[in-house]
Amino acid sequence: MKKLIILGCTGFIGKNVAEFFAREKKYKVYGTYFKSKPFKNNSITFLKADLTDKAQVNKVLQGKDILIQAAATTTGSKDIVSKPYIHVTDNAVINSYVMRSAFENKLKRVIFFSCSIMYKPSNKPQKEVDLNLNLDPFKSYFGAAWMKIFIEKTCEFFSRFK
């Protein structure tokens, strides 16, 4: 049975994804938590990990086949504007360690959730082809948007190694 790990398993997205795969019974499901206590689900093996610590990232990814990266430092849109460094620094560190460790541990699949923070405000739905990296993102989201783009490019970088 393939081993699937969901980082950020106690967050909104991570919990829903973990519960879905736990019901499927096709995978041995692992989930990380840090500040939020794990919820009750006997089909998920919970692992406490500080994902800003490289050694702990390596430990939870060892021996896994599939990674779903749903972990992040999040505090809300107010902090994105008033204290943007919180999201930029922690999430850049977390995702850099996660992507490197996934590569070094030879995980077969990595799923990384992105968002639309890097797009300019618009009255029409945006597509990936609408992103112009020559233009700065919306002023209030400058740091978080460029961090997200950096991590997307980090995923692409590691995907190029065979």
Can you say where each PLM-predicted feature lies in the sequence?
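Short loop/helix-cap segments at secondary-structure boundaries that form the rim of catalytic
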Residues: S36-S43
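Conserved Rossmann-fold NAD(P)-dependent oxidoreductase catalytic core, especially the SDR/UDP-sugar
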Residues: Q69, S96-Y141
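N-terminal Rossmann NAD(P)H-binding glycine-rich loop of SDR-like oxidoreductase domains
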Residues: L4-E24
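Active-site Tyr-X1-5-Lys
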Residues: K139-K162
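Rossmann-fold cofactor-recognition segment
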Residues: S43-D53
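NAD(P)H-binding glycine-rich loop region in Rossmannoid oxidoreductase-like domains
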Residues: L51-D90, E104
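Conserved glycine-rich Rossmann-like NAD(P)H-binding loop of the short-chain dehydrogenase/reductase
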Residues: K26-K35
